[in-house]
Amino acid sequence: MKQYNAIKVKYPDALLLFRVGDFYETFGQDAIKTAKILGIILTKRGAGSSSETELAGFPHHSLNTYLPKLVKSGLRVAICDQLEDPKLTKNIVKRGVTELITPGLAIIDEVLSPKTNNFLAAISLGKQIGISFLDVSTGEFLVSQGTKEEVDKLLQNFNPSEILVSKQKKESFSSQFSYPYQLFYLEDWVFQHDFSIESLCTHFKTKNLKGFGIENLNDGVIAAGAIMHYLSETQHQKINHITFLKRIPKEDYVWMDRFTTRNLELFYSNNLNAVTLIDVIDKTISPMGGRLLKRWLAFPLKDINEISKRHEVVKFLMEDLNSLNQIQHHVKLIGDIERLISKVATFKISPREVIHLKNSLEAIIPIKSIAEKSINTSVKEIGLNLSNCDELRKRIKETLLENSPVNILKGNSISSDYSDELKELRRIAFSGKEVLDKMLTRESEATGITSLKIASNNVFGYYIEVRNTHKDKVPEHWIRKQTLVNAERYITEELKEYESKILGAEEKIMALEIEIFNNLVQWLGKFIKEVQNNSFLIAKLDCLSGFSQLAIENNYCMPLIDDSYELDIKEGRHPVIEKQLKAHESYISNDVFLDSDKQQIIMITGPNMSGKSAILRQTAIIVLMAQMGSFVPAKSVRMGWFDKIFTRVGASDNISMGESTFMVEMNETASILNNISGRSLILLDEIGRGTSTYDGISIAWAISEFLHDNISKPKTLFATHYHELNEMTSSFKRIKNFNVSVKEEKNDVLFLRKLVPGGSEHSFGIHVAKMAGMPNQVLKKAHMILKKLEKSHSNEELTGKVKSIKEDHQLQFFNLDNPILEELKEEILNIDINSLTPVEALLKLSELKKKIDN
């Protein structure tokens, strides 16, 4: 245990798998955890002695079965292997940790999800917050820096499996980022700028980082350097597939804070078994395409030209169904070449996976041919940039057998035609039947024993078996090996020599196959960038083909995007809700029009369950889908591009931070109001409902007024129960009232789910309570109370008070009866601003301020 303890002390945070012969063993607390997670037997080592300790283990060949379960449980697992052949040493076998598997550094297929990246992140808390992401399974390495809100958003989009943070900044990180991330703390010296630059330049073999366009991202570079250090610390030395460090160009993408991503349920939902947007729009076929689609959804584009290029490809493939079908057919034959080529770099690839890589690259050839002939410029460009990888495919075909096994140690991976030496060794090893038949015939004739049999087993090797009735005919030079009830087994010098020859050939075959395969994998490393480029192009084409398939299946339209400030949606639908309707049901579509001049804010009133929230969400989703390059669920859409999408929809507590539902709502709304622009789309649902009625109306009114009067004029949909807000349209020219209509029939209400002009006077909350099965006694009492409240608190009374506050505020502001204010007014009016220099203007402003202060 001395050797084990010496290694374990170096990896106190990891579960240590200690190789002992044919088993991986765990001891002590590690054994208790292992037995519980894997469901294997927990035993004792040295039971009853002073060195007694828990023990649990499994066969070494079962590592790929058990390791994923340990990593998925959130453990860091250190694999300690035997570094020398036990047969060649008389001392304790030398052992060492060959790899440290962590949640963020997993390249095991059983741990990874095909259409989801597995990112490791590092965060540097400096002047700005630096952040870097690495998916070691694909080689994608990204860097950025920014504010807390920007980094928070990136964390939600990339959803890292593990985050590296400085030990000294532990509390600072926890106070800013409250989500339950898997964290690992590194020493503070790792997060140094010079150290990071040196680490990155050493890996990329460059003198500086200017070629990556990140030299000004000091905090981002520090985060990226921390990741490189972590790779080294965890024994990940073979990382040639990490070929580039890319800046995340935040200015190119639509800004959506983490609340918006959550509220729109793009990737996740708080409701169990709920369908998300990605579930509906993902028509990709390849793993690479699935991963890229998630990136496109998280980062919609702002550049009209780039968006239009995607739309044109989708349109082209919809019109050329033959090309679409052919492309999708061949993409199905392509495996995850991005992760396969990463396995080449890390030497974790199997013979069967190399064959899979070759077959996948062969499936690219017809795709390249189709794309090159395309009349669409973007598709043609993809075709021209795809590589046939002729040399790579040829070498694999010459070297490996098509039915190569998963493990090189199983043998029969290398083609005999590739090596004359291998061919000869196989002839010796596998032509044994012919040799043994000749030997059997010769010995039978010499002894006169017709029932002789030559066979072998793992214990005695080859032998000649003679039944007892003929054992008196056995020659003296035969050597007895084993006695059975009815027979005797012998060996001869000739048979012994032959056995030695066969066993020697089999060992040499195995060694030669391993050598040839390792040389092949090393040679394949030259094509990493070429295959990675193919992977990206196929992923891109897969996404666009998926958009075409999506539009065909669901009758989506091509949105028209321009530089205007309008949003004009005709018969828009919610893509997720419409897919969940029953066969006989149809989705009630709705029109939405917003601009900066006449209809900047739409105030939507209507009953509970009438569909207000759905209209808000579908508007945002249509804009988002349009700017990610997809067609959209509507009859037509014409829109100016948006740079920010904000949503405040739904309610949730943040108990861990001590925040109520109302506080969370106010935080999210404040974030929106502090970050709006002229190209923002804002969706607000039931703002102010978490407090008293008067507080709620006051807050909702003030927010609406702020948005209306703001110079940016952000386009806004505001769904509310406060019917008093309908009065705002008379005072604010760009606020228009709409309601989600209902039809009252006797004591029943029919939700029509249609957005129509005009405000609504009723919420029908009691009717919804009735639908929920509320007792009649409660419903009757509620109805009586409602009638009394409606009489005592009329809309006119409430809105009159709000309007008078606004008018009083304006009168007070412009009341200039005060002599000092009158003097200031005259002085300001007499200033010739055209002749003032900037410095003189500042001095004049300072002078006026002093007069007011005095």
Question: Which residues does each PLM region occupy?
Answer:
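Charged, surface-exposed helical/loop "interaction arms" that form contiguous linear patches used
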Residues: 346, 350, 360-363, 416-417, ...
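Charged catalytic and DNA/RNA-contacting regions of genome-maintenance
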Residues: 1-316, 325, 329-332, 336-345, ...
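ATPase nucleotide-binding head domains, primarily ABC-like/P-loop NTPase cores
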Residues: 12, 28-29, 217, 285-286, ...
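Amphipathic alpha-helical transducer elements in NTP-driven molecular machines
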Residues: 1, 17, 28, 60-67, ...
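Amphipathic heptad-repeat alpha-helical coiled-coil/stalk segments that mediate oligomerization
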Residues: 191-199, 255, 266-268, 359-434, ...
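Extended, charged coiled-coil "arm/hinge" scaffolds of SMC/Rad50-like chromosome-maintenance ATPases
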Residues: 401, 484, 488-521
